[in-house]
Amino acid sequence: MSLSGDTTLAKIIVVTSGKGGVGKTTSSAAIGTGIALKGHKTVIIDFDVGLRNLDLIMGCERRVVYDFVNVINKEATLSQALIKDKRTKDLFILPASQTRDKDALTIEGVQGVLEELAKDFEYIICDSPAGIEKGAQMALYFADAAIVVTNPEVSSVRDSDRILGILQSKSKRAEDGKEPIEEHLLLTRYHPGRVALGEMLSVSDVEDILAIPLLGVIPESEAVLKASNQGTPVILDTDSEAGLAYMDAVDRLMGEERPLRFLEVQKKGFIKRLLGG
Amino acid sequence: MGIFDYFKSKSAPSSASVAKDRLQIIVAHERSKRHQPDYLPQMQQEIIDVIRKYVNIGNEDVQIQLDNTDDCSILELNVTLPEQN
């Protein structure tokens, strides 16, 4: 990690995008859960102060007592604010404050919390708010790696490129002249049928434009909404393509080789095609 | 896709390829500006104001670009003057 002095093994991963609504929180929840499932002690921090939602996606909204800002302001200890996930061992959530705004986050405050977490956790996932303003910059400042969540759509790709510029210039690693943040592209809401029809940017189109290594492609899937309705990270839905694609992405993040899948159009029956179903 | 779609002409470029072309241009443009110093837009405006004291030009007639190579930075200033009558 790129915090001050002491060397710990904790890896800080920011999940970011610039654009809103592309699946940052869904991806943070899925990937954090996936890493914990592999036996690594993991915490997911919601940096979206004022608009907290990670708690809902993780299904722990009724267990929030203290939050990230309370810990920064020393109104609560870290162990009081951390919520232990009920389904997955080794997984904790640090919720965002709902009553403050992004100004409640300070570099020193965030650094203090991350340093304390790094003593105890192997992976720290920072779920960034949308935008390129203070909240997003705080979420990425201390990161060792970044997962850039992108939809195959013009405004999302452009915003992802903006956020890559910020990762390369305004992070602590950049300011200290250290090895740059590891960048990973996660393409979400991918619709192979529309790509085949030339109606949607393909994986290779987006890779050509952003020029960063591909971590995974998550197909558009009904399972994502179903999972968020129920407050269960979609990665636990092992019957769904989206869940399996997230698990593949986690495996790749851990350095394993996994071929891409779910990128082909599913063949429809002749009658269904004829009727336009 | 229903049966009638099969009769549609496929000659126009796909919207995805249009999207890719547009993105490649705008992203390249924005990347080239990324490493420019913050004072550049203001300096550009002041240069335009000075030139305008003498020649009637529009904002788009002045292009300013800063290129960094390994050992030096080159400030390129391109002014399109109006045709003389």
Curated annotation (Swiss-Prot), chain B:
Recorded superkingdom: Bacteria
A biological process (GO) of this protein is:
regulation of division septum assembly
- Provide this UniProt record's keywords sorted from A to Z: Cell cycle, Cell division
Describe the function of this protein: Prevents the cell division inhibition by proteins MinC and MinD at internal division sites while permitting inhibition at polar sites. This ensures cell division at the proper site by restricting the formation of a division septum at the midpoint of the long axis of the cell.
Family of the protein in this entry: Belongs to the MinE family.
- Which HAMAP family would you find in this protein's record? MinE (MF_00262)
Q: What is this protein called?
A: Cell division topological specificity factor
**What organism is this sequence from?**
Marinomonas sp. (strain MWYL1)
Gene name of the encoded protein: minE
